[in-house]
């Protein structure tokens, strides 16, 4: 049985809050991004990546545009060590990319880390120790003073070994479990580390404040970051970094509000992979900025390709509703949504506006490698006439008359409902043609001839009706009127033509014409037919006969 009384809030609000960050509307520039896919992401996989897979993933991150990439914890295992050496010895690290390695604040681990870095042109050495109340009391059984000494001893050793090792080394410190640490104590630990390192304008250090486990609402984390930023020593020479996880589902919100509160840098992963519920998803963060007109400095212009590579290398699946990247994130099944999108697309084609503003689509799918035809309007039993007509128009060139769209919509939706499945564009085309186009039962057109008379047009129609040859004659003001009068003269049917429309089929055809006819019975019912033929006159006759044949059904 659930019992909320066993829980209490485990986070710490700052002793003072200015909330200056709440006055900012949006993030105006991209932070420094650091991918931790090859460490945090990899350690969370059921089957960690092999050496070759890691190398491929590293190249993938470089292609996306990451300039800082955490490549592992080289002292943790031979695999991690070998991967780092492979990158260095095979010169796989571009000059504009800085690798990052993780180490605990323990002497033998730090020494092993620097051994692994020999030959690296430039690297961030990321040292951490846990500072939270729970970790101090339950795991390490150490006092605040003892935990601070672990941090400062690690910082001193880092500085000494960096001086003794060839290469350009930058330092990063994380008070792990920061959000479960008393804020002023976390500040004291970070300032003590900074006093050891003495950062300068030409040699800045990184202080990383992780949401190791989410404990609060996002505004609390933002207030913590703002307090740390305002009270931290050497602030102008410190890169203030974030490392949010997603335990409460607020990883993106934590990050965005903390950036408003003064942070400069973000550590995260593609698609939010990571321990438990994952790290913050950098793709979502970057594209959220992009939709506000801010260049995220990362290239996500081919998300389908990136998704396939990620799923293959990690053996993980991207959730269908994952923001921006999921298979269904642009899909509209609802009839009203489809209608609004279709009208928005037509409006954009007509007006050519400078900025993107389409209902239900916060980003242009083309910008991230998606297609309107296959990704946006999706048809099932919940769809509407606008969406179905949009699919037929965009994929196959059918400009269905407005009054006919409702009938076609109900027909297609009924098929989807009976099959209990989504209909792809080719399924929709098949239904449309089978129900409306060139219907030849019971009447099948063989030939039609017209003669211009002073009194109008005379038509001679050669048909097969239920397999029996027939020859009908009729007069009218125009060709279609003459054919209609001939059909009614030789049958018991009574109707009037209420809609006629024609156009060239310019998608996937050889100069064919398409016509649509709606006929209304005396009781007010309207039945629709369509005809397709190389000759527009024949197409219009076929459309009329299709509609008349459907009256008999």
Predicted ranges, named:
Residues 1-107, 371, 376-379, 383, ...:
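N-terminal capping/small domains of soluble enzymes
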Residues 2-39, 293-473, 509-512:
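A mid-to-C-terminal "edge-of-domain" accessory segment
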Residues 4-7, 33, 44-68, 84-90, ...:
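Alpha/beta enzyme core
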Residues 40, 44, 74-78, 132-134, ...:
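Short, small-residue-enriched loops and turns at beta-alpha junctions
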Residues 209-211, 239, 267-275, 287-299, ...:
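Short beta-alpha connecting loops at secondary-structure transitions
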Residues 216-351:
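Catalytic alpha/beta core domains of metabolic enzymes, predominantly
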Residues 459-463, 505-528:
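Positively charged, aromatic-enriched nucleic acid-contacting surfaces
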Residues 525-528, 532-553:
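Mixed-charge, glycine-accented linear interaction segment located at domain edges/termini
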